[in-house]
Regions:
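Transmembrane helix-loop boundary segments of multi-pass membrane transporters
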Residues: 34-47, 105-121, 141-150, 246-253, ...
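Helix-loop-helix module between adjacent transmembrane segments
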Residues: 45-135, 194, 266-274, 291-293
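A generic transmembrane alpha-helix motif of multi-pass inner-membrane proteins
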Residues: 345-401
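Hydrophobic alpha-helical segments and their helix-loop junctions in multi-pass secondary transporters
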Residues: 98-105, 109-122, 126, 130-142, ...
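Selective recognition of specific alpha-helical transmembrane segments in multi-pass small-molecule
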Residues: 92-102, 153-163, 191-199, 214-243, ...
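Membrane-interface helix-loop-helix modules in multi-pass membrane proteins
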Residues: 6-70, 193, 205, 210-244, ...
């Protein structure tokens, strides 16, 4: 069963390509292009830079965790926090996996609706079948191996599309007319916080962290940041040069549309099959399920995400920002637990309050919803405890003001 959830001994470049491919996620292609077209250089950078920095910052944290512990899941790494805190983390992890999978479905449907089919259900069935074929029998090993191929395909497809973009001049100002301040409030804040907090609660990252040799974790994640940056950069350039904001419209219904569909499909499958591996590892390692039950959980995840897509009218960017706020709720608690700088009871109640308030506040907050994303990041600091200071107080019996 272990080989299904961790794959040791792969080449560094294979791990880095897998991390980059998983982090790209299909909608990043659309977001990079549309932000460049509509919001210009500033809007594009508000998406690109946080994405790259996320992998760079997490490299330091992942190295520290691997030096301290071995395991399969994030929840195993925070065992000391107690059952209630673990349940909160599990609930958020499962919610994020459902939302992330739904976002991948939405990304592919944007392409298929222009090219082949209009049914969201058909789109979900097609990509679900492909993802299950990739990892249903081999698990994380199959995911990492195919990610290498998928990254190469994405890069080649992106270059082909860039050289066939119908535009002779570059527009760095964008077409929306929004100021930098407006962009920062409506997109930049939630995006930056949501992205920077993402890996700490994302089981797809932790499976790779625990698969990589501890001496190579830092180097591998830095390499993945560089590999990742190339893909949105290519599609951002397409947005700067193009005369259309929607990339799926830009390349019409011909051969180039097929190239775009292949690129999106590879990005989607990288994240999707990683999500399937993540859900199975959580079910088996945290709930004691058998390998067969773990595989059934993959199907359950696909069904739940399909229903979310079909029964709502939510857009890619909206869902991305919403679940970004949700996963932010447990990012700081994860860091505090790993650093052993927390009070168990205070951290639990601070995390619980954050999980209950921030996502709902974001949904109802209108133009001020970004404030709830900030709250999701900051409120858990109430659970902070400086253990070193506590020890000094016990020794001296007095406070130093």
């Amino acid at each position: 069963m272990k080989d299904f959830f961790l794959w040791k001994g792969a080449h560094d470049l294979a791990y880095a390509s897998s991390i980059a491919s998983t982090w790209i996620w299909a909608p990043a292609i659309f977001v990079a292009s549309s932000k460049a077209y509509y919001d210009g250089l500033w809007g594009f950078l508000m998406f690109l830079i946080p994405n790259i920095l996320t992998l760079v910052f997490f490299a330091y944290f992942a190295k520290m965790v691997r030096e301290k512990t071995e395991g399969f899941t994030l929840v195993q790494a925070i065992e000391s926090a107690g059952k209630n805190q673990k349940r909160l983390h599990l609930a958020v992890s499962l919610t994020v996996l459902i939302c992330s999978t739904c976002v991948q479905f939405l990304g592919l449907h944007l392409i298929l609706s222009q090219w082949i089919v209009n049914s969201e259900l058909v789109s979900a069935i097609v990509v679900s079948t492909m993802a299950l074929l990739m990892v249903g029998t081999s698990g994380i090993k199959g995911s990492i191996q195919t990610d290498v191929v998928k990254y190469v395909v994405m890069f080649v497809c992106g270059v082909l599309l860039l050289f066939n973009t119908d535009g002779s001049t570059i527009n760095l100002a964008g077409h929306s007319g929004k100021s930098v301040g407006e962009l920062w409030k409506t997109f930049g804040v939630a995006t930056t916080i949501g992205l920077l907090s993402a890996p700490y609660v994302d089981q797809t990252f932790w499976q790779r962290v625990f698969s990589i040799d501890k001496e190579k974790v830092f180097k591998t994640f830095i390499m993945s940041a560089m590999l990742f940056g190339l893909i949105p950069l290519i599609f951002g350039l397409i947005g700067f040069y193009s005369g259309v904001g929607e990339i799926q419209v830009l390349f019409g219904n011909g051969i180039l549309s097929g190239v775009l569909a292949l690129c999106v499909l590879c990005a989607l499958l990288s994240t999707l099959d990683s999500n399937l591996c993540a859900i199975s590892s959580i079910v088996c390692k945290e709930f004691g399920g058998s390998l067969a039950i773990g595989k059934l959980s993959m199907v359950a995840l696909l069904l739940a995400s399909s229903f979310l897509m079909i029964l709502t009218d939510i857009t890619i960017v909206e869902l991305f920002l919403i679940y970004g706020t949700i996963r932010t709720c447990v990012a700081l608690p994860t860091i505090l637990i790993i650093l052993d700088k927390y009070d168990k009871q205070r951290l639990f109640y601070a995390t619980l309050a954050t999980v209950l308030i921030a996502p709902i506040g974001y949904l109802l907050g209108g133009e001020y919803n970004y404030l709830f994303t900030i709250m999701a990041l900051c409120l858990p600091i109430l659970g902070f405890k400086n253990e070193t200071q506590q020890i000094e107080l016990c020794k001296t019996g007095k406070k130093n003001w």
